[in-house]
Amino acid sequence: MKKQSKTHKVDYKYYNSGSKTSRNRNVQQLETNNKIPQSDVVGPVVKISKEVTNETDIISPNNPIINQNQEIFDTYQKSYIEAKKFLNDHNIKISTITLDCKLGTLIDVDLFAKNVILKEDQIVSVKFGNRNDPATNRTIVVLKTKKKPSTKNFYNQVTILMKPTNNPERNYINIKVFKNGSLQMTGCKDMEDFNNVTVKLIEILKNGRRSKKDNKHIKFITDPNKIGIYDVKIRMINSDFKLDYKVDRKKLAKILKKYHGQNTKDKEIGYVECKYQPTGGHSCVNIKYNNDGNKTSIFVFQTGSIIITGAKNLNHIISAYFFIHKVLSRYYKKIKILPLQQNLVQLEIAKYFQKVNQKTYPVEIQE
């Protein structure tokens, strides 16, 4: 009996892209194929929730293109859920996703910073303008701060902190809200985090608030009817995993430069662009991997920790994972740092002191 895919509800009422005609065409085409995308794919304007399967979720670098061209949508090698399963099965963790989008309306960042209500399940921190102004720099949580706090004053954007309510264990997500209606977001672990906090933020901006003095409505945005999620773009995904052995970075860098330089004849791995600076910079071998025009950085540390940064989607991470494993597997015996065996170490120490005790020293005779 075939196992049914797990379904979840997605609210598309704030998702917008393209003209009305193109949106309707996309709705019909996607519904016909039963491929209503969630995650980061910008969906059509729909007032009701849709039942969608996890198997159709895909992380893509440019959502409007996906929404306007079903063929591009179908060219992605793996679905979002399949890619996430691969990462989980291979203990690859997403550390952060950096992305941005547009809300389709201007925002009065000054009024927003001064009047937005801070709540634990919504916005918990606001930073705007002069960092010494308590009216526009407020928080209800205690967080670790930088040793040297920023002294720069920003008047074109508000920085807020929000935690995804769908996953309370997540750290706070840092969101920069700009006057022109753009958002820049860091700290998401997956696109569900993005969807959760963005929809909540839109509701806050759309509702505004009532003034305590005269009960007048304070508007945070210029056009509540046009606010939505437009042009979502993933800028970078950082991930990491751990090897079960330690790596001799010096040997690895030497091997790559010797056998995989620009004039290499190796066809399987080919040219590998790498840097290793033991003093200064990263204490790792920095390998650049080009995947379909997207240059991903792979950091190999002595501890066996591997960081993959600069990916635009999950398939970039998976491709970089296979590449670095191909390199490390070929030279495994040469680059692996053998662990010290305690019994052999103790035996060598005992032999050393035994030799020291057996030595005879000349004795001075006093006349």
Swiss-Prot record:
Keywords: DNA-binding. Transmembrane segments: none annotated. Residues 1-26 are annotated as: Disordered. Residues 16-26 have a biased composition (Polar residues). It comes from the Viruses. The keyword DNA-binding applies. GO terms for molecular function: DNA binding. Belongs to the TBP family. This is TATA-box-binding protein-like. The lineage of its organism: Viruses, Varidnaviria, Bamfordvirae, Nucleocytoviricota, Megaviricetes.
